Amino acid sequence: MTTAQAQIRNQTMNHDVAQQALDRQEIIETVNKIGLMADLRNWAECRASFSDQVEFDYTSMLGGQPTTVSADTQIQQWKDFFATTFKTTQHLIGSHTLTLNGNTATCISHFQAHHVFRDTSKGKTWTLGGTYDHELSRTTKGWKVTKMKMTALWEEGTSPFSK
């Protein structure tokens, strides 16, 4: 290998490492932004994390099957539900583990979501903990979530979904 070839190889490797670091940071920010923007009720920014069609899987908590819906529809459902059900919420998401594969990625994270009810007849709060499994695709507008799976591992308080 010539010196010039070695320099080109090193530059390419450095670029790849830098791009991978940028991708990892953008993916983590995209995932974190979903919970934070929902908590801030900034639904446009929450929506910006998603592709146009997204598979949502809440079967560990709600039963049934995963559903694929437009992100706009899901955001509107969350907006309506949060407005009528919760005074405030706080989603803490961390311990991100990423797998990058070209223009697709997965991000598995722990979460803890604290919810303060408007109607306190079932209690003041509900806290849920578990994992998120996000699948993302690189787009011209950055990384977008194409699948979001929530696996509930524990909860305290009364779920708003309990009868």
Name these PLM-found stretches.
Residues 43, 47-112:
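A solvent-exposed, acidic/Ser-Thr-rich amphipathic alpha-helical stretch
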Residues 5, 20-21, 25-27, 55, ...:
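Hydrophobic, well-ordered secondary-structure segments
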Residues 17, 21, 65-68, 123:
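Charge-dense, low-complexity intrinsically disordered segments
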